[in-house]
């Protein structure tokens, strides 16, 4: 059985983010195009299966019993926003470009839990379960994901992979869909091998401009 959580309300800061997104249509201005930076709030799009990384206050009915993570086709769901944070405090200053090979945390904006994986089987495929874990952005070392990309920094127009630091699996979707109570949502899981199933692209969101002193920043930003 799946179970609903406590339904914690979003705080004022999170509501402010969502208001800004609604006023901008969920898209950053053209002049902000370029690099993904620390502190940005965005949606992640799986390019193979065309779903956005998603979570919600519904727990797995098997495995860890932690908050579930799925993929959704809708582009306008507020439960698909994630904040880019450093692996440790001070490691990812606000506005600094995310480096290829850098470890980051992806914090779900509306519930404050971090993207997480561990050695539990996923419900539909028996791959590695991916969940959302922690409170107010504080979790553990199994919340760390390495950004795998070409070049020096994570570019918004480029597809990247997220490889889990602790278990080496890649954040993946292979197309399987859940029934009730989250009918039509896709299973998100960890897979051992790099493939088209684990390519992700930055989509709608608020992108913090690179700081002037940050290396690799674009002049027009």
UniProtKB/Swiss-Prot annotation:
The UniProt record lists the keyword RNA-binding: no
Pfam families xref list: MIR
Keyword terms: Endoplasmic reticulum, Repeat, Signal
Classification of source organism: Eukaryota, Metazoa, Chordata, Craniata, Vertebrata
Protein name: Stromal cell-derived factor 2-like protein 1
Span of the signal peptide: 1-28
Residue ranges of the motif Prevents secretion from ER: 218-221
SMART domains, per the entry: MIR (SM00472)
Annotated organism of origin: Bos taurus
Location relative to the cell: Endoplasmic reticulum lumen
Principal location: endoplasmic reticulum
Superkingdom of the source species: Eukaryota
